[in-house]
Every structure is written in C-alpha cells, then in structure tokens.
Amino acid sequence: MLRRTALLALGLALALPSVAAAATIQFNPPITCMQQGKSYPLGGSGFTPEYAMRVTWEGASASFYPDSSGALPGNESSEITAPEYDSLTPKTLAITATDSNPATTATLSIPIVKFGSNLPVEGKPSKVVTWMFAGFVNNAPIYGHYLYGRKEKKTVRFGSGQGPCGTLTKRAVRFPIKRPKNFGTWEIRIDSNPKWVRSSESLAETSFTVAKPRRG
C-alpha cells in the first residue's frame, strides 16, 4: 500500500508543469544611472528561448531574441539607448520586457539624467550663484578648472557627486579669482581630476569673458 501511494505521488509530481523562474532584466555591466542619449547593453534571463521579446521604455522599443537558455546576452546585440533628457535633475525611467509565448514580463526602474553642469559663469564674476552637477557617480569628486590661454590659473573643488546619478547642487562664486591679471576669453572645465589634465575628457566645459574693470 505504501509503495502504491509513493508511486502515485511520483506520477502526480511528474504530471505537474514545472514552474519557470521569474524573468529578470538588468544592465551589463551594472549601472546606477543612465546618461541621456547613451546606449547600454541589457541582459536578462527567464524568457522563452529563441522567441522574440520586446523591450519598451518611454516611447521607444526594441526586439531581441533570447538564447537557447532564455537569456539576453547583455552585449552590443541587446543595447537600448536612453532617451533625450535635458535636465540635471534625475527622473525615473521604467523599462519593460515582455514575450508572449507564454506571456512573460520583467520590469526595471532606473534614474536618468543629463551628465554635466549648468555652468553659471555668465554675469558678475563675484556673485554667488547656484552650481548644479550630474554624472559624478560613486561619490566622484567635482573640480572646476579655470583656464586662460589653455593654462590652468585656478582649480576649485565643489564637492562630490551624491546618490545614484552623482548629483550635487552648491552655492559658489562664479569666478574664484578676486583680482585677475588676465582679461578676455577664459575657459572652465569640469571633471574629477584635482589638477587639469590636457588629455582628460571634461564632463562639462564652456568659455566666458572676464572684462577689464573700468577705472574711475
């Protein structure tokens, strides 16, 4: 009797459909924030093997084919591009991946922001203004290099990026040199280097004019 019961239980277990693992999506390599307009490889698992799946995000979509194990490769063949977003204040982007054989859905929410700075250098040099920065992830330091004739004249440390998108808002003077000896066109370069490196890429940069003060 016990043997018959055990065999019956085994038969029922074999007859039940297996429960598929929940589908998931993630960026490969992992990121904490998307830069507007930049492409990122999307990986995933738990989808119908070799069956078309669709990924949608803020008015855009793309179709991919998972491999024989139901996984997305997370390389150039499964990239998605962040939408244009002209703001230094992050917003949340929702990404949804679905297939219909059987219906499978995975979602991912991630902040998106414009990397850079508002660069408020136009106006009275001595005025204290609001500086905004974004894209300095992992608490990266934020430096502003003031250049004249392509030579570094002053470097200011504004602080460090905060949160998943490496943002910072700080009140600081427009132009940190009280009595400049050079007038005309200056440049400012924003990056994470304590000293300006000519070959380094800036996260934000612009030129501005420092006028010679009038006498009398």
Residue ranges and their predicted role:
Residues L8-P17:
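Bacterial N-terminal signal peptides
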Residues M1-L8:
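Bacterial N-terminal signal peptides that target proteins for export
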Residues L14, A21-G216:
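Extracytoplasmic/secretory-pathway segments with low complexity and glycosylation-like composition
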